[in-house]
């Protein structure tokens, strides 16, 4: 089965959790014999790995939109990605940046569109500061794509609740929880109290640890 994964981020251009998620997802899909996983990502051409030639495509902003609002530049890339998905059997988009590419591909090729919900535009109103009027466009893109998607994957039960609260038109049966996983071949617990003490942490006392970008959306202020 050919699956096309659509994302703004993909190594080496990764700046957030969604990019890490997509990279690990694609690695797992490409390890399967029954899946041919293609990647369509924003940005400069990526180096190809042996045995994966022709499976990863990159898309730069359209030159004609170089001075346009960022949301319009995103839609320009989405159009190019949708054209590049010819031959797909299923498209899987991540974040609003790639959602419209997935939505258009589903319409154009009559294939299922699966969306992974990493964050939601209605819950990030401060993005209007970054995108200006483009925030209305990004919100429209997300709503349109989610409401038409064959399935929505939420990374937690709380995210599923947020999806249904933000977009009540979506059938709850189409929203599924798939938690972010950890590859235990690469990550496993290491018990080393001496090393922990070297880092200035007392292993005999409870610790509260935050791992993530220090941005408003992460809710660090609530933890503090």
Which residues does each PLM region occupy?
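A conserved mid-protein helix/loop that constitutes part of the nucleotide-sugar donor-binding site
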Residues: 20, 206-224
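N-terminal subdomain of nucleotide-sugar transferases
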Residues: 1-47
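A short, charged, and often flexible helix/loop element on the N-terminal side
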Residues: 46, 50-85, 129-130
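Carbohydrate-associated surface elements
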Residues: 158, 181
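A short helix/loop element that forms part of the nucleotide-sugar donor recognition site in Leloir-type
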Residues: 188-201, 207
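A short beta-strand/loop micro-motif in the catalytic core of glycosyltransferases
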Residues: 91-92, 147-157, 176
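Nucleotide-sugar donor phosphate/pyrophosphate-binding loop at the beta->alpha transition
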Residues: 111-114, 122-144, 161
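Short His-centered aromatic/hydrophobic patch
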Residues: 93-98, 117
């Amino acid at each position: 089965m050919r699956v096309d994964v659509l994302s703004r981020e993909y190594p080496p251009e990764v700046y957030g959790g969604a990019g890490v998620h997509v990279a690990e997802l694609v690695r797992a899909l490409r390890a399967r014999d029954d899946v041919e996983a293609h990647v369509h990502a924003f940005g400069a051409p990526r180096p190809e790995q042996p045995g994966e030639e022709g499976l990863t495509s990159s898309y730069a902003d359209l030159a004609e939109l170089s001075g346009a609002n960022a949301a319009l530049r995103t839609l320009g890339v989405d159009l190019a990605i949708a054209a590049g998905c010819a031959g797909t059997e299923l498209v899987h988009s991540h974040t609003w940046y790639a959602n419209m590419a997935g939505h258009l591909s589903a319409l154009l090729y009559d294939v299922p569109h699966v969306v992974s919900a990493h964050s939601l535009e209605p819950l990030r109103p401060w993005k209007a500061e970054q995108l200006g009027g483009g925030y209305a466009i990004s919100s429209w893109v997300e709503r349109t794509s989610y409401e038409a998607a064959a399935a929505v994957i939420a990374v937690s039960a709380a995210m599923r609740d947020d999806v249904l609260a933000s977009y009540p038109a979506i059938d709850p049966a189409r929203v599924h929880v798939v938690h972010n996983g950890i590859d235990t071949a690469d990550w496993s617990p290491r018990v080393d109290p001496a090393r922990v003490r070297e880092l200035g942490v007392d292993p005999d006392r409870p610790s509260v640890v935050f791992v993530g970008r220090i941005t408003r959306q992460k809710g660090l202020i609530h933890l503090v």
